[in-house]
Each structure stands twice: as C-alpha cells, then as structure tokens.
Amino acid sequence: MQNKGIVICVAVLLTLASIFYLSFSFATRYYDSEAAKIKDPIAQQDYKDSVKYLGVYSYQNCLETQIGLGLDLKGGMNVILEISVPDVLENLADHKTDAGFTNAMKEARAQEEANGGDFVSLFINAYHKSAPGHKLAEVFATQQLQGKVSPQSSDAEVEKAIRASVQDAIDNSFNVVRTRIDKFGVVQPNIQKLEGQQGRIMVEMPGISQPERMRKMLQGSANLEFWETYNSEEIAPYLQQLDTRIANGDNGEEKTDSVAADSTVAKKEVAKAEPKKAEAKFSIKKKDDAASKVGEEAQNAAAIKAHPLLARLQLGGGLSTVGYASVRDTAAINKIIYSAVAKRVLPSDLRLLWSAKPADNLKAKNIFELHALKVTTTTGRAPLEGDVITDAKDEFDQMGSPVVSMKMNTEGARKWAQMTKANVGKAIAIVLDGVVYSAPRVNGEIDGGSSQISGNFTIEDTKDLANTLKSGRMPAPARIVQEEVVGPTLGAQSIQMGIVSFVVAFVLLMVYMVMMYNVIPGMMANLALLVNVFFTLGILTSFQAALTLPGLAGMVLSLGTAVDANVLIYERIKEELRSGKGMKQAVAAGYGNAFSAIFDSNLTSLITGVILLTTGTGPIRGFATTWIIGIVVSFFTAVFLTRLVYDYKLNHDKWMHCKFDTPVSHNLMQGKKYKFMSMYKTTFTVAIVAAVVFIGSFFVRGLSKSIDFTGGRNYVVQFENPVEPEQIRTVLGGAFVNADGTKATTGAIAIGTDGKTIRVSTNYMIESNSPTVDDEAETILYNALKKANLVSQKSVEAFKNPDVRQGGSIISSTKVGPSVAKDITMGAIYSVLFALIAIFLYILIRFRNVAFSVGSTVALAFDALTVIGFYSLLWGLVPFSLEIDQTFIGAILTVVGYSINDKVVVFDRIRENLKLHPKGDRQQLFNASINETLARTINTSTSTLLVLLCIFILGGDSIRSFSFAMILGVVFGTLSSIFIASPMAYIVLGRKIKEEPAEEVAEVK
C-alpha cells in the first residue's frame, strides 16, 4: 500500500481532533451532574454561574462547543424570518405617493405573491410598464440614497444602488437578530442567511420553552417613536361625523355586518355620544335571562347598520384615548378609519393607533384603546425617534410595576425637553412598531434625556422590550413565514428512540458482518464502523453542527454505506482467493479492484448529499450534514484504515489463513448464471404497468401534501384518552373562520400507534402578517376541543405548555407561510431534477458512454416514481403518516443517491469485463457482470434494510415516513439496477437483446 505515512498522519490528527472536541461534552456533563446534586434550584444556578467563566476552557466554553442537539432532540424553536424587501424599497423612495411608483409596487407585490421571484426585478419591470419614459432616478434620488443616486443616474446605476441597499438592510437585520438572541441567553443558536432566498434568515433556538416571547422579540422592528397627541374631546366630533357619513353610504362600500358589538357598555357609550333621538332608538339595555339570543343579535345588527363605527367603538377615555373596542372589532374599525371617506372627514394631521395591550381595567374583556396622535413634521414622521436612545433597562417604578427606563443622547435630550415643555397637560404617546405602549400625561418639562415606558407589563415583557431596544432597530419589518416548536419532553422521547434505534442497528450490523464474513474480517469491518462513528461525531462537533433525529438517521445510513465498501472489498478478496491467489496477493487485488466501484458509488452519493445540503432546510440539512461526513469518513476507514491493519498483519505472517466466508455465505450466489437480459420484455412491461398505475393514482387519489407544500399550521396534540381523527375533524369543522368569513380548511391525522396523539392541520389566516394570529389559532383550537370535552386544561396557556401533559396539550407546532410553501415546492422539483442531471453527467464522464448514463437515469427516475406512487396508493391506509413534506423530498434524493450505488457497481463490473473480453458476446458479458455482483448486491441491500427497519420500528414517528421511503427505495432500487438500468444501457448501446436458450448462459470467454 502506498502513502501509508499520509494515512497514518490523517488518522492520528482526526483522532486527536475528535478527542479534543468531544471532551467538551464530557466536561459539560460533569458540571451538570455536580449541579444536579444541589437540591435548591437557585443555588444550583449559582453554582453554574460560579464556574461559567473559570479556567482556560470554562463551563461557558464547554456549553458552546459541546455536541449540539437539534430541536427534535432537545426541544425548542425553529423559525424562518423574512425581511420585507418592499418596505426597504418604500423607505429608499422616501414613501413616494405618485401613481407610477405606487402602481408598480402593487403590481410587484401581486407578482411576488403569485409566482415568487426577485422583488427588485419585479418592481423595476412593473415601474417601466406603469411609468413608461420615466427613469428610476425620479423616484430614488432621495436623502436615503444621497451620494449613490442623483437625478442624472441611469437605471442601471439606480438598480445597483437599490440592490446594495437591500443587501445592507438584510445584513443589518441579521446582525440585529443575532444580538437579540444573544441577549435572550439562548445556548448554541444557529442563525444563518438562507442562500438563494433573498431576505430570509433561519433561526434555530434549542431549549426555548416560551415561543410567544421569541415571536414578539424576533418580529419587533424596534421602531420607537415619540408623538404629540390630540385630546379625545378634540377628535370625538370628527368620529361622530365619520360614523354618520358611513351610515349614509358616503363611501358606497360599507356593508351591513351582523357581527355583534362586544359589550353592552360600548353601546350605551355610543348612545351618549349621539343625539337624543339616536339614543332612544339604539341604546341596547341588558336583557333578562329569558330574552332570545336571536333578538339580541338582530338589535346589534340594527345598531351596527345605523352606527357602523360608534356601535363598535366606545368613545371617551381622556387625554389621547379617543375610545375603546373589543379586539374582534378592531379590523372592522380599521377599515372605517383608514377608508377614503375618513381621509376627507378626519384631520389630515391625525393618526389613529391602537394600544399594545388591553386597557388595565378591561384586560379580562380584551378591550383595547384607540389613541389620537398628531403629526407635527412636514415629513409625516415622529418628531423624536428611537435612534436617540443610548440605553434601556427593565426596572420597577415607585408602585412596584415593571417599566422600561431609557436614556437619550444629547440631541435626543434637547428635543425631548422641547417636546415635553410644549405639551404640559397633554399626553405624549410612546409608540413601538406601530402600537402605543404608553401615553403618559406631561406634568412639566423633562430635561436630562430620561424617559420611561410603562403599561400593563410583566417582568418578562419589560426585559424583552429593553433587550429589543438595546439591540437596535431593524432596517425593515420582519415576519415569521415558517415556524416549528417542539416541546422538551417530546425531544427527550426522540433522544431515547433515536439512541435505541442507533444501538440496535449497530449491533445487528456487527452480527451480520461476522455471520457473513467470519470473525476476523467481520470484526475488522465492525472496528471500522466504530471508528466511523467516533470520527463522524468529532467532525460534527468541530463544525458546531447540531445533531438532529434525521441527522442521527443519516449517521446510521452512513454505516450502511461503510458496510457496502467492506462488502465490495471482501467479495473481491473472495474472488481472488477462489482464483488461486495467496492471501497477500488476494487482499491487495481485492482492495485495488474494488476501489473504482467504491469511489464512484461514494462520489455519486456525495453529489446527492451536497444537493440535499444546499437545497434543504432544517431537518434535511441535518440529515445531509451527517450523511456527507459519514460518506467521507466511511471511505477513509474502509479503504485505507482497514487496509493498513491487514497489511501490517500479513507482513508479519499473521492472518495468512484468514477466512472471508462462513457456512452461511460460502456458496451464496456462487456460479449462478441467471439470464437477466433476456427477461427485459417481461420486466419492462411490469415497470410500464406499474408506472401507469402510479400515475393514475396521482390523478385519482393524489398525494397527502403537508403544509410544507400548501402552507398552513400544524399542531400535534396529545390527549389523555384515545381519540379518532374523524372525531377531531368533526369537532373542528367550522371552528376556524378567516377574517373574510370563509371557513379555513382543517384536517386531522393520527400520529403513532397509541391513539392519543393527533396532528391538526389548518390554513387559518395563513396569509395574515399579524403577530397575534398564532395565539388566536391556538385559542380557537383550545376552545373547540374544550367545548367537546376532549381536553380538560383550565386555561389556554396550560394547553399550549408542552410539559403539562395531563388534560391534553400541544406538544409541538409548525407554521409554513404561503410564500415559503411555493418556494419549497419549486425547490423540491429543482433539487430532484438537478440530482438526476448531475448523476447523468457524472456517469457520462466516468464511463465515457451515454448508454450507461441513460440506463442509470431512467432507472433512478423509475425508483423515484415508485416511491412516490406507493405514497399515493397507501396514504390513509397504513397506520402512520405518508404526507409529502420536506423530509420526504430528502428521502427521495437519498433513494437516488443510494440507488445509484447499485447501478455504478454493476456498470463498473461491465466496464471491467469489456476491457478483459473486448471481443466477447456483449449480452453474455452483461449477464455475467450482473451475476458476479449478486452476492454484493444481496449483502449490501440486506445490511441496509436491517438498519432501515430498526429506524422504521424504533426511531419514532418523526422519522418513520422517511425510513419507509428509504425501505421502498432500497428494494426497488436494487431491482431496477438489474432489470431496468442494465437492459436499458444495453439497448442504448445499439444492441438487440436475443432470446436465450433454456440452458444456462455460458461463461464469457
């Protein structure tokens, strides 16, 4: 063996590096076990804090460098944030209102929503259509782009400046998000910009148990503003006039709505604000218990028809508070106060904004305040903004209530003093991200630059708000377009199931190798497997990549790849021994002859793994990472390390009589001469019929698409008692109603086999950007299940807590926005096609014959069609989920990567025999090559199926669908290598397959 020194050096370096990085995990375990001995939780945390920064490698270093666990193993939260590129463009254009710009923005938004694409390009194309003959510089020669764009700039120069500014906004947003998460104290977060998806940032936060706090913190743009205000009595007459004009049909759009007003109090206040006649007619008094509910709804509808605004908005409140309204009426009120008629009636310098939280004395009723802000600047912006804040702290006021105290810079302090001096006796509204957090009365001039945000806050609220303000302002609004939340208890169960499946699969592989190849070769292969796992974990830790359940599956599958390499080598050694060579020569020839097949099969798998890594997100990337590492490491351990050991032993005259077979495998597929090629008519007919059945099933039954492809929300709910999915579907029928009155689609499927776990899917308000919709959806789900006596939790908060299992709870949730769903769909199609094209080209380059490329690609396409077809035929008929999601697409690509191994091994043997017998009968040569590799095919497929069956049975629900797809792929991939790929390659070579006689095929001469 050549280059032994390099192999030894690499092995030693890998060993030392793996020991170094894995040692951090052992150190963390030691500190945690010492802390666990302390009973008092506060003292326990004090101990961890005391050692947090001690030593060269402190406890904090160990935490940050140990093996990270993904969400499915540790619990936590995964989100994809989308930075609003349209908002960036509007800021760069200084919020222009001319028709060309506004129409172009509207058209670009519509095109992006319908088809996706680069928003900047969509806008520029739309602008040229809506404003022909006008240059982009007319819109973007603004203060924001001063020095980059002038009125004389060409469109190309403006586009370059816009793209640079958009990228700067995304980069700044990324930094702000990272700072906020660091301040929140998340250990080992994974934050990355998604390549090829402009404006999207993926954030993985293991261990997070309060998703509501994280949603608010991540989506808050920290756009802090200080506004002067109107007094409520100044605005009330305008609102009364607006109400009258809307009721009289002034705008021609307001329709009669049967939505009931929130409370009797609101209606009484409306009456007070109206003339006596209206009061007598529309004041709705409290009914006695016998009153009909239908009659009450009719009166409410009549009141709303007569007073569209004031039947929903209770006037009064004092200072800047012009009125109160139930949260369910705010959408209808917004439609009125932002309507065209409102622009004509209300003062032009008036802005109406809602409070961030319900009013203190009306919190239980979910009543919000409407504040009247006064625009005092020519630009329409607030006179004082958050860029003047130098520090923010969460504190307590004199009454012991949580508040946020802020300090301003010199310029901010000067403006703050002027502003408070000019508004003594009035309120100044403190607005954050478009909602009013507080509007305190100004009692006198405030100098020194101090200010305070108070309100109906909890300690967590003020802490998060202070951290958000200190982290800086987001350059553009961000919203969560995809989200997954996993409870820690579910993560612990996943760890247990993952470890069990891994250990059982590993033990079975070791037993299988010894059973098939005898003790010494079998244990050598097993030693290579152990080293493989050790190196894989070490490299994974050094990359600071999180270990997920799909990642664990990738590691287990890489063991199958490692076994395949050992099987190829051992089968070659057995051939050389049967030809009469000595042990040294047989081992050398076995390793040498198997190298090309191992190299090609591993490289094609690697190509698929890289495609998975670059196109996938979340769990798919976790799987791809460990699989890629496993492929590289298994190649090194199987081809080089085991060779070192054999050479060492044989050079010292040991293992000279080593056996590479057992009574079980001695005659396995030896001397077989099956006539595979002449079966092509039968096998092609079966394949075509199967393809027709599968395609027909796509049209008749379709596929069970997950929210990854449709958009929506998933909630995995665990009940105390077994329930039927049909029962859940009936209970939730009509519960989720969108804002436009349409019913949201709702589904339910069973997860696992205990009958207590159901996954609920709905597309409720999935188009909405409101951060409150997530909470609303969970509340609707809780109320519907509670009403049906399916859950017994006393509050929605307990129902949403994944650790409170008794009484039923949500143990995990997922959200996928419609734009992400479209991108996932296109990404899935492109990734599969790209994988097939990449493998086609590689086979063409390596085998220098298009016939092998065509044969392998057709067979791979059939493999993928078969797996998808079975999912179409079987969904709803088997006791586990067969939804088409991102994980399934990962499985398809993995099937492609694994299946090509079989094809490459067979084609490699055909290529070798073509060189050895250039004048031999081609058909017999093809048959002989397939027969010669049958033992390898059976051993590799069996060992891989052992691994996959362990994952399928023991690995848990989250990985069961993936392993089922892989099982189908291994079975049909093996068959297609023999019955489709080889005959197809032969036919493309221009050969006609002959009908062979009944006797066995003669050996190739």
Cite the ranges covered by each PLM segment.
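Juxtamembrane "pre-transmembrane" interface segments
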Residues: 204, 448-452, 460-507, 780, ...
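Interfacial helix-loop-helix hairpins and adjacent transmembrane helices
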Residues: 1-21, 26-67, 90-128, 156, ...
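Hydrophobic alpha-helical transmembrane segments of membrane transport and translocation systems
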Residues: 531, 538-539, 575-596, 600-687, ...
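Interfacial segments of transmembrane alpha-helices in multi-pass membrane proteins
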Residues: 2-4, 404-405, 409-424, 428-429, ...
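Non-transmembrane, solvent-exposed regions of membrane trafficking/translocation machinery
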Residues: 22-31, 49, 65-77, 81-433, ...
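Pore- and gate-forming transmembrane helices of large, multi-pass membrane proteins
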Residues: 177, 489-509, 561, 581-617, ...
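Small-residue-enriched core segments of transmembrane alpha-helices in multipass membrane transport
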Residues: 12-15, 522-544, 555-562, 623-638, ...
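Cytosolic juxtamembrane regions of multi-pass inner-membrane proteins
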Residues: 560-604, 647-655, 872, 878-940, ...
